[in-house]
Amino acid sequence: IVKRFAEYFCEHIISGINFSVDGKKVDPVDPLLWNQKGTIQEYGPLPVPGYPGITLKIADVLNTEGHKASYQKQGGYVFRCNRLIVGSLVNGDKITGFWNVDPHWRGVRWQLNYDASHDVDLGTTTRKDDIAPKQELMDKIREIVMPIARECHRREKEQGIIKTKDQTEQLVKNIKSVANDPLITRTISSKGAL
């Protein structure tokens, strides 16, 4: 329950409201890692054009300190009245025109915040735990998110190539180091003599 509270009410906790469960203080779990070292705050929080009261922010969390960008946590997060109601949105039943779950997009996160006055625009369910947004609104969000997401994706791929090259160079150094180790050389020589 503490983990759920930390995720669902992270915006309230970040704003200074304290929660505790069985006497244990609940720390926020912000899916955008907005204020963490290494997070690139790409956009926002800014209003979605034509929808005052709906704000959007986008982050690149690939190099966020102490966090490995999770494959499953990529995509969008929707908060109603500062409470998370839907997370990890990618192409699927609720939204289209974004990206499918892919390791090269794992660092891209976006967050949509809205209040109860926009329940119709977001198609908020009566239980306030899911959405079926209007296509016009999703088109506007996509127009903002996707160019930034593509740039994050490009950086991710470049960084992956660089890492791969660096990792290969390190592997070669390790092999050379092992090959020149006198103890290993003697062991190989003695086994060869058998």
Give a label for each model feature.
Residues 21-45:
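Active-site-proximal acidic segments at structured loop/helix or strand boundaries
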